[in-house]
Amino acid sequence: MTRHLVVMLKEPVAGRVKTRLGQGIGMTLAAWWFRHQTRKLLRRVDDPRWRLWLAVSPDRAGMTSRIWPIHLPRIPQGRGDLGDRMGRIFRSMPRGPVCIIGGDIPDVRPTDIERAFRMLGDHDAVFGPATDGGYWLVGMKRVSAVPLGIFEGVRWSSEHALRDSVTTLGSQSVGYCDQLADVDSLEDLRAFEQRTRRAPVR
């Protein structure tokens, strides 16, 4: 059965993406960083072991944007909070396990994605915890219907996001991948640059 990896992306417009990072380095530079980081990410995770999709926002501009690779299929994120949009993605994808990631996780590698899909062989859902209490990946096996209440009441952008999300899955079995760090602030960016200088290639 085909595996599906979905990367959620926003158009890299200054003042609309990475605004917390922009407070430290300027909105234009933050948008530039996001654009180039996501393009590198897409090159890394475009892998024959799964089908790569782009979930884009804003819906209309994202579907026609020339910023992202034109050979990758796109779907609009639609309205609502992050939970609404991810729930819609899980319900709309073709048959097969689905993993969703964002574009702001510079440490993620194909080995991390492969590990997540393998965990879905033994679990109904999988999460990749982030260092801030959220998560960089969520995946679902989807052998049964996606719960209607998935992601309802989650306190997004807080240290409770992961725990709240797991709670919405009820009795479904959950596995956890390695913890990774996203880049939301100047401090996060500095920490990533330090890791890059000293970390071995994976």
Segments from the language model and where they lie:
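N-terminal nucleotide-binding beta1-loop-alpha1 segment
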Residues: 1-20
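A short, N-terminal amphipathic alpha-helix
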Residues: 32-50
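Short beta-strand/loop segment that forms part of the nucleotide-sugar
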Residues: 50-58
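Short phosphate-binding loop-to-helix
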Residues: 64-97, 158, 168
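Short aromatic-hydrophobic micro-motifs that form the base-stacking/packing surface
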Residues: 99-101
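Conserved donor-nucleotide/metal-binding helix-loop-beta segment in metal-dependent transferases, i.e.
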Residues: 108-135
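Short, glycine-/small-residue-rich phosphate/pyrophosphate-handling segment
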Residues: 143-166
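Conserved alpha/beta core of the MobA/IspD/sugar-nucleotide pyrophosphorylase nucleotidyltransferase superfamily
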Residues: 160-202
